[in-house]
Curated annotation (Swiss-Prot):
Subcellular locations according to the entry: Vacuole
Tissues with expression: Tuber.
Residues bearing carbohydrate: 103
EC number(s) recorded for this UniProt protein: 3.1.1.-
One of the record's GO cellular component terms: vacuole
Entry note about domains: The nitrogen atoms of the two glycine residues in the GGXR motif define the oxyanion hole, and stabilize the oxyanion that forms during the nucleophilic attack by the catalytic serine during substrate cleavage.
Key word Nucleus present: no
Coiled coil: 309-372
Motif range (DGA/G): 203-205
Protein name as annotated: Patatin-2-Kuras 1
Residue window of motif GXSXG: 63-67
SUPFAM superfamilies according to UniProt: FabD/lysophospholipase-like
Length: 374
């Protein structure tokens, strides 16, 4: 499933743009976190380096909602200018803070959760770090309800739009501020002229509908066009793009069918919850379908890997069930997913595909380092 590093591939591997995309899904972020822990462990093993981190291998890391939080955790520098969190630290983060984030602190007429604990823990963990300090290019989405436009936070856009150099904790809260669940987030930055620039942001899934893979790939394409290191890459040259997309599991609500008679009895809240669940699941499916088709049409199908569990049941479908029992189930979902085949047509498991992915990422990193030394 993953491109082998033989033949002519090695000649251009060093110029390949590598992209990691992480879906939104609340507490279900435990599933991609489990996958990331496995991948980072493989990179450490392949390179015989226990300090290897995901940010060392990906040119672009993008995420929305809980995926944006994961993106920040693995790209925000500590005092040694290394990622403040290893992949193995993410699942424990959810276990420690999830029950406090998803508590019953909301009101009947407002969001389900007040978001105060979430913002507090993000401030504590991410400090005053801003976008420009991220250890690799990031793509974190949100949506401004005042301007009615998506807002995409990336390093490469700061020269043109310095007001986007926001604090990472503001960005993380904003991308996670799912309507119904958390309040919108207001904060202020400044333009190049020193003028105040206001943000009124909600969940990034409003902009990317849960799956930020297309957004992340778009940022990577622009990066390839602007960076001399990727001078041989032409627009839409997917042979030189390597995309790993991690899902948070499809929702059983998407698989369930309803009759007009049944839905006619729903109130506004039931409709809102159902529409959000259905839209996210449907969009995730269509994004994967589109990317699979495009990569295949350009004879680059082995450069795209979507890791997704399509059979969530029970409490694991809920984005806000942070009970210890459910979080344990989500870890099991991620671990079991690694053993499942990538597709019905291939016996290769996700674990095997990710091992080869790790080897490819390692080889590409070494080739680029060798090229830079000349």
């Amino acid at each position: 499933m993953i491109l082998a590093t033989t033949g002519s591939t090695c000649a251009t591997l060093g110029e390949m743009v590598t992209v990691l995309s992480i879906d939104g899904g609340g507490i279900k972020g435990i599933i991609p976190a489990t996958i990331l822990e496995f991948l980072e462990g493989q990179l450490q093993e392949v390179d015989n380096n226990k300090d290897a981190r995901l940010a060392d291998y990906f040119d672009v890391i993008g995420g929305t909602s809980t995926g944006g939080l994961l993106t920040a955790m693995i790209t925000t520098p500590n005092e040694n200018n290394r990622p403040f969190a290893a992949a193995k630290d993410i699942v424990p983060f959810y276990f420690e803070h999830g029950p406090h984030i998803f508590n019953s602190s909301g009101t009947i007429f407002g969001p389900m959760y007040d978001g105060k604990y979430l913002l507090q823990v993000l401030q504590e963990k991410l400090g005053e770090t801003r976008v420009h300090q991220a250890l690799t290019e990031v793509a974190i989405s949100s949506f401004d309800i005042k301007t009615n436009k998506p807002v995409i936070f990336t390093k490469s856009n700061l020269a043109k739009s310095p007001e986007l150099d926001a604090k990472m904790y503001d960005i993380c809260y904003s991308t996670a501020a799912a309507p119904i669940y958390f309040p919108p987030h207001y904060f202020v930055t400044h333009t190049s002229n020193g003028d105040r620039y206001e943000f009124n942001l909600v969940d990034g899934a409003v902009a990317t509908v849960g799956d930020p893979a297309l957004l992340s790939l778009s940022v990577a394409t622009r990066l390839a066009q602007e960076d001399p290191a990727f001078s041989s890459i032409k627009s839409l040259d997917y042979k030189q793009m390597l995309l790993l997309s991690l899902g948070t599991g499809t929702n059983s609500e998407f698989d369930k069918t309803y009759t007009a008679e049944e839905a006619a009895k729903w109130g506004p809240l039931r409709w809102l919850l159902a529409i959000q669940q259905m839209t996210n699941a449907a969009s995730s499916y269509m994004t994967d379908y589109y990317l699979s088709t495009v990569f295949q049409a350009r004879h680059s199908q082995n450069n795209y890997l979507r890791v997704q569990e399509n059979a969530l049941t029970g409490t694991t479908t809920e984005m806000d069930d942070a009970s210890e029992a459910n979080m344990e189930l989500l870890v099991q979902v991620g671990e079991t997913l690694l053993k499942k085949p990538v597709s019905k047509d291939s016996p290769e498991t996700y674990e095997e595909a990710l091992k080869r992915f790790a080897k490819l990422l390692s080889d590409r990193k070494k080739l680029r380092a060798n090229k830079a030394s000349y």
